[in-house]
Amino acid sequence: MSKKNSKNKAGSNTIALNRSARHEYFIEEKIEAGLSLQGWEVKSLRAGKANISEAYVIFRDGEAYLFGSSFLPLQAASSHVVCDPTRTRKLLLSRRELDKLESLIARQGYTVVPLALYWKQCWVKVEIGLVKGKKEHDKREDTKAREWDREKARIMKNKHRG
């Protein structure tokens, strides 16, 4: 059985990406967490109806929750269950990971945001990142570096065409 490495293509394991997080924050550390879901949410994730671009992680009573994500219910979803697309979903992390994240957020000004939502075998996983916010000049430097890398690749491509 071969692994699937494609991102957001047919047959991909990726459900949703938070592209703005890579632009807005310095990503210090990435952690994989499970997600506690209801049945209709799993069905909507299989259909790819998820958005995590405005989401972040909050800590309450020693537990971590994904706040601000939206999973749109399907039209054919069960009518006896009330579907709340923006409900807070519990993250499944070990006690050690929870304590570490909570202490870093409290002391050093870090934030925890979701970076990606994906399938791992039959389970839905969320990749969360321990991040610090970028200043405006940091964003500009990243943009300049990215544009220069593109320009270098373009020059090398034209040079080799010859």
From Swiss-Prot:
It is found in: Cytoplasm. One of its GO terms (molecular function) is RNA binding. It comes from the Bacteria. Residues 137-154 have a biased composition (Basic and acidic residues). Residues 137-162 are annotated as: Disordered. One of its GO terms (biological process) is trans-translation. Pfam families: SmpB (PF01668). The keyword RNA-binding applies. The keyword Amino-acid biosynthesis does not apply. GO terms for cellular component: cytosol. InterPro entries: SmpB (IPR023620), SsrA-bd_prot (IPR000037), SsrA-bd_prot_CS (IPR020081). Keywords: Cytoplasm, RNA-binding. Required for rescue of stalled ribosomes mediated by trans-translation. Binds to transfer-messenger RNA (tmRNA), required for stable association of tmRNA with ribosomes. tmRNA and SmpB together mimic tRNA shape, replacing the anticodon stem-loop with SmpB. tmRNA is encoded by the ssrA gene; the 2 termini fold to resemble tRNA(Ala) and it encodes a 'tag peptide', a short internal open reading frame. During trans-translation Ala-aminoacylated tmRNA acts like a tRNA, entering the A-site of stalled ribosomes, displacing the stalled mRNA. Belongs to the SmpB family. This is SsrA-binding protein. It comes from Aeromonas hydrophila subsp. hydrophila (strain ATCC 7966 / DSM 30187 / BCRC 13018 / CCUG 14551 / JCM 1027 / KCTC 2358 / NCIMB 9240 / NCTC 8049).
